[in-house]
Amino acid sequence: MANTAQAKKRVRQTATRRERNFGLRSKLRTAIKGVRKAVAAGDKNVAEVVFRKAVSVIDSVASKGIIHKNKASRHKSRLSGAVKAMG
């Protein structure tokens, strides 16, 4: 257990950051699933709208350092390809 005041503060900060990161990561996964679901349903208009929202979430999470920028680019590229392949 943390003994010094600094160590106790670091424990508190880590817990706060962990909760925040968990929520943002969850939002990211939900956004990606939404695009995948729209693509599977075959509705291109809905897929494009959901894709734009997902890109916003992906960029937001990447800018906060939750995921690496290359991983964000990979997600966006694959989702974009799936939406464009709909026809």
Curated annotation (Swiss-Prot):
InterPro entries: Ribosomal_bS20 (IPR002583), Ribosomal_bS20_sf (IPR036510). GO terms for cellular component: cytosol; small ribosomal subunit. Coiled coil: none annotated. Keywords: Ribonucleoprotein, Ribosomal protein, RNA-binding, rRNA-binding. The keyword Membrane does not apply. It comes from the Bacteria. The keyword Ribosomal protein applies. GO terms for molecular function: small ribosomal subunit rRNA binding; structural constituent of ribosome. One of its GO terms (biological process) is translation. Binds directly to 16S ribosomal RNA. Belongs to the bacterial ribosomal protein bS20 family. This is Small ribosomal subunit protein bS20. It comes from Nitrosomonas europaea (strain ATCC 19718 / CIP 103999 / KCTC 2705 / NBRC 14298). The lineage of its organism: Bacteria, Pseudomonadati, Pseudomonadota, Betaproteobacteria, Nitrosomonadales.
